[in-house]
Amino acid sequence: MSDKFGEGRDPYLYPGLDIMRNRLNIRQQQRLEQAAYEMTALRAATIELGPLVRGLPHLRTIHRQLYQDIFDWAGQLREVDIYQGDTPFCHFAYIEKEGNALMQDLEEEGYLVGLEKAKFVERLAHYYCEINVLHPFRVGSGLAQRIFFEQLAIHAGYQLSWQGIEKEAWNQANQSGAMGDLTALQMIFSKVVSEAGESE
């Protein structure tokens, strides 16, 4: 792992443990995951829709709202490099620059407002994949990103429903997307996306 603190040193972990430092001082992984799940679920229910105009600061605000009870660094961009399997996420030193550039592109596309469903799915898959590769936070990027795009979809007249999406298929689609093939991700989003108010 490379970071600004020295090779192999992860300041987010308790010394000698593979456990994230947390405000609850929990040092058992399963207990920490359960506490995080419960607390973020409560916080997620209180997050307001937010403005149409959104950028990296808005994504950081969502993360801070979700994880403020658990991590002191909630809402702060990560300062170490992280991986999922063999797939590296964006080098930490480039997150802010790349994230702002990506959000600028999203703004220039009008935050995907006014697109027909097929085009919305195509562009949503692109931006979702790009922000996933960015993975701006040490943990919790996925949940913050999901809420960010749920809000974006609502502003664009759509809604996202994640029910029935298998974790393995989702992870594989994101890995393929990181390698430049968005086909599987687009197929998943074609099922996830529906017009706002549309009943199943």
Curated annotation (Swiss-Prot):
Q: What is the top EC class of this enzyme, as a single word?
A: transferase
Instruction: Identify the SUPFAM superfamilies for this entry.
Output: Fic-like
Domain Fido, residue spans: 54-195
* Spans traversing the lipid bilayer: none
The organism's superkingdom is given as: Bacteria
- Please report a single Pfam family linked to this protein: Fic
Name of the protein in its database record? Probable protein adenylyltransferase Fic
